[in-house]
């Protein structure tokens, strides 16, 4: 008897599993609050050099700025330079001594802002950019905050993946909760950018535990029939978090209090672990039969399933545990040992890199669309709901491969057409940005389903772990690609769209899995490949 048969006895989907999904909803909601937090946390408001003796009389301020600040090519005042000497502005009298800028002498040479900056605080009262003047020569540091965070997620994913297999999902989930809470509070109390960068990187590592542990902890208590439904249901919690971030960001305009607001809910999450069950499958692989028996009996009781006395006896569970332990632990090298599996793994790595790169690249670019940042964030969250409906319908009728390629192609086209729109603030540009975000979310949802069906059962978790790892690398590089706007304003969009297009073409190289039986072993994957080649040869001959 295997573990799937045990689940049939105690109920593979019922009140026990629904309660588990509800208890694990909190980390899914909190993840986007942290992953997309740089939209508000690291925002750079309009700014200009702080000037000496700026007049209080508003009617004279424009003339005063004209005397001190050079203009950019688009006619706006420079954000990073001021004139070395005030320039002449005719027929205007300013200053405490009654001088007019027309009386002031000096050439038109400029210099950096030596007295700091003044910021437009109408949208944000405080961000890390205004806190530590991360503008002009230091602007890259503001954008790099996202990269530091995602690098932490990348490292944490590797660590939590290994440790949760060794010490258990529930115990490591507690570690993730506590460490994320402590490090999040430390980030909010940062006294320097260096301290903030370090604590945010470590916070990313801690939160990676949620991404690695929560999904297996849900799926390992579900029967095969309900795993896809549960996966789609769980993904809506992420969408809820995306929209919730818009509300929280709107209500809290100071970055320290905002960081506290998204960190403190981790505390009740720690308490909720009292009711979260450990994975009985993992317990059996470790030979901890008594604990597994206790959780399985609890599952049967909550699901209202009468269990035969010998069905969950220690002897029966010991036999299952022995069967689970004799299976050789898979390694990442197994994903590349055979031709077909190597092909699938390499293609999935490209697809996941493209999906993450385009998703986070667009999700973090919420300024300059003709709406304020809060409206844009809400729109970006709301469009994810119809995106999930699109995926649900498309994978059933068009198939997984075409859906994956089509959604990535849609994201690439939306980004490409935006390059042709004259104004970023036009309604067309805004609509295309929302469409691109919707397609990238649809590609993300499809990738989870498609990838899980491509890998055989013995390597499914290993394959998902590898592709997720490469995907997080794409998420780490996405904020850095935004720095390319210093070379050409549209270059970041070209990068996001180009990578999405490459991933779309790569997805077409993957085999279709619609209505196909899931492979159990590596041999099943290779055997299917040979069958497809034989069918292709017959079609060519006929």
Swiss-Prot record:
Subcellular location: Basolateral cell membrane; Apical cell membrane; Cell membrane
An example Gene Ontology molecular-function term: prostaglandin transmembrane transporter activity
Physiological role: Functions as a Na(+)-independent bidirectional multispecific transporter. Contributes to the renal and hepatic elimination of endogenous organic compounds from the systemic circulation into the urine and bile, respectively. Capable of transporting a wide range of purine and pyrimidine nucleobases, nucleosides and nucleotides, with cGMP, 2'deoxyguanosine and GMP being the preferred substrates.
Membrane spanning residue stretches: 21-41, 144-164, 178-198, 202-222, 228-248, 257-277, 346-366, 373-393, 402-422, 430-450, 464-484, 491-511
GO cellular component, one term: apical plasma membrane
Record flagged with keyword Cell membrane: yes
Gene assigned in the entry: SLC22A7
Reaction equation(s) it catalyzes: orotate(out) + L-glutamate(in) = orotate(in) + L-glutamate(out); 3',5'-cyclic GMP(in) = 3',5'-cyclic GMP(out); GMP(in) = GMP(out); 2'-deoxyguanosine(in) = 2'-deoxyguanosine(out)
Taxonomic classification: Eukaryota, Metazoa, Chordata, Craniata, Vertebrata
Name the UniProt record assigns to this protein: Solute carrier family 22 member 7
Organism in which the protein naturally occurs: Oryctolagus cuniculus
């Amino acid at each position: 008897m295997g573990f799937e048969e045990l689940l049939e006895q105690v109920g593979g989907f019922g009140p026990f599993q629904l309660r588990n999904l509800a208890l694990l909803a909190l980390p899914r909601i909190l993840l986007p609050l942290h992953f997309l937090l740089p939209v508000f946390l690291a925002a750079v408001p309009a700014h200009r050099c702080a000037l000496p003796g700026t007049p209080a009389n508003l009617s004279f301020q424009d003339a005063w700025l004209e005397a001190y600040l050079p203009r950019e090519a688009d006619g706006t005042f420079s954000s990073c330079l001021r004139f070395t000497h005030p320039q002449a502005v005719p027929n205007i009298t300013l200053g405490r001594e009654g001088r007019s800028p027309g009386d002031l002498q000096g050439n038109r040479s400029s210099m950096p802002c030596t007295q700091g900056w003044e910021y437009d605080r109408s949208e944000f009262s405080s961000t890390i950019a205004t806190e530590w003047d991360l503008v002009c020569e230091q602007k890259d540091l503001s954008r790099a905050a996202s990269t530091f965070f995602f690098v932490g997620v990348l490292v944490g994913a590797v660590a939590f993946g290994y440790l949760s297999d060794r010490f258990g999902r529930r115990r490591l989930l507690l570690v993730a909760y506590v460490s994320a809470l402590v490090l999040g509070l430390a980030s909010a109390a940062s006294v320097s950018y260096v301290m903030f960068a370090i604590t945010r990187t470590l916070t990313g590592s801690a939160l990676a535990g949620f991404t690695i542990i929560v999904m297996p902890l849900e799926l390992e208590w579900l029967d095969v029939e309900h795993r896809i439904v549960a996966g789609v249901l769980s993904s809506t919690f992420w969408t809820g978090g995306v929209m919730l971030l818009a509300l929280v960001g709107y209500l809290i305009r100071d970055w320290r209090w905002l960081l506290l607001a998204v960190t403190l809910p981790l505390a009740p999450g720690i308490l909720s672990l009292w009711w979260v069950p450990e994975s009985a499958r993992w317990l059996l692989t470790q030979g901890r039969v008594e604990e597994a028996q206790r959780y399985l009996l609890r599952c049967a009781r909550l699901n209202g399933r009468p269990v035969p006395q010998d069905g969950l006896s220690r002897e029966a569970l010991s036999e299952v545990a022995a069967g689970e332990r004799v299976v050789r632990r898979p390694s990442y090298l197994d994903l590349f040992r055979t031709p077909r599996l190597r092909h699938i793994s390499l293609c999935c790595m490209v697809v996941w890199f493209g999906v993450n790169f385009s998703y986070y690249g667009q999700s973090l670019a919420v300024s300059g669309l003709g709406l304020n940042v809060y409206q844009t964030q809400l729109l970006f969250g709301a469009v994810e709901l119809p995106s999930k409906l699109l995926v649900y319908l498309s994978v059933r009728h068009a198939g997984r491969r075409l859906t994956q390629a089509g959604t990535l192609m849609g994201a690439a086209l939306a980004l490409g057409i935006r390059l042709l729109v004259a104004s970023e603030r036009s309604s067309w540009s805004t609509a295309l940005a929302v469409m691109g975000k919707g397609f990238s979310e649809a590609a993300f949802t499809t990738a989870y389903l498609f990838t899980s069906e491509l890998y055989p059962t013995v390597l499914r978790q290993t394959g998902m772990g590898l592709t997720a790892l490469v995907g997080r690398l794409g998420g780490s590089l996405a904020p850095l690609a935004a720095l390319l706007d210093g070379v050409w304003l549209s270059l970041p969009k070209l990068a996001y769209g180009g990578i999405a297009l490459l991933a779309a073409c790569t997805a077409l190289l993957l085999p279709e899995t619609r209505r196909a039986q899931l492979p159990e072993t590596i041999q099943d994957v290779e055997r299917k490949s040979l069958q497809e080649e034989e069918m292709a040869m017959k079609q060519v001959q006929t």
